[in-house]
Design a protein with these regions (language model features):
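Phosphate-backbone binding interfaces of nucleic-acid-interacting proteins
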Residues: 1-152
């Protein structure tokens, strides 16, 4: 006679198999993708160490009036909830699809005025060319990473 616990374990094992199958990574064909060459000029470690990369939560995102490219992000950087960063990625993303996501930003850049708005950092994106068209992916991480988490 099988114990009730044995039935539960067997059930969990059979349920885990389909779940594991769903997690198989989708294979992407990168044969038509071109990337920029890596910089040959080296950056010394002290200069790199001044770059402060942080996880940021996207609290709000909106198109910048009179700009076809710029999106205005209001971000939680773990210290204050009003860091504003502008990014020229509107061609690739609609504002509403980014709210609530966790992105990566460099927060140690001096403010830069763009379209009358001070941008207080830079969001990190990956850029490539595919079949003659530029592609861009905003670097987003697991939403379980808290705002302000430092990247090393």
């Amino acid at each position: 006679m099988k114990s009730l616990d044995a039935d539960k374990k067997a059930s969990k094992t059979s349920e885990a198999a389909p779940a594991a199958a769903e997690k198989v990574a989708e294979k992407v064909d990168f044969s038509n993708v071109k990337i920029e060459p890596i910089f040959e000029e080296m950056v010394d470690f002290d200069t790199f160490a001044k770059s402060d990369f942080r996880a940021v939560k996207i609290l709000a995102c909106e198109a910048v009036p009179k700009s076809k490219k710029l999106l205005k992000f209001t971000l939680d950087d773990g210290e204050r909830k009003d860091r504003v960063i502008l990014s020229g990625i509107h061609e690739y993303y609609e504002p509403e699809e980014l709210v609530g996501k966790t992105a990566i930003a460099i927060v140690s850049l001096p403010p830069r005025n763009m379209m009358g708005i001070d941008s207080e950092g830079m969001l990190i994106s990956a850029v490539h060319e595919e079949d003659g068209h530029e592609g861009l992916n905003l670097l987003m991480v697991n939403d379980r990473i808290p705002a302000g988490a430092k990247l090393y």
